[in-house]
Amino acid sequence: MIITTTDVIQGSEVEEYLGIVTAEVVYGSNALRDFFAGIRDIIGGRTGSYEELFKQGQEEAIAELEKRARRMGANAVVGIEIDTGTINVDEKGALLLITAIGTAVKLA
């Protein structure tokens, strides 16, 4: 399956637009990781634990997007966008939300 951020796939023609397809991944916060990320932020540098979490979340969201698109009969997803956000649970933590959205299509 082709999954791309572009609306056009060079050398391919869209036979049918099947609709919008979305996928979401939600992670709970980890107090220990948050603590060390906070220290790293104070002294400078990158927070590798969060970078890895974002990378993993994006990969999982794209995999789920592909699975849902296949169920719609698609062989490609065009115009995908990945977004991140947080959902505040309480004063002690939040959830990390990663969403992927695109248009499921059938290529000729």
Swiss-Prot record:
It comes from the Bacteria. Coiled coil: none annotated. Belongs to the UPF0145 family. This is UPF0145 protein Tery_3795.
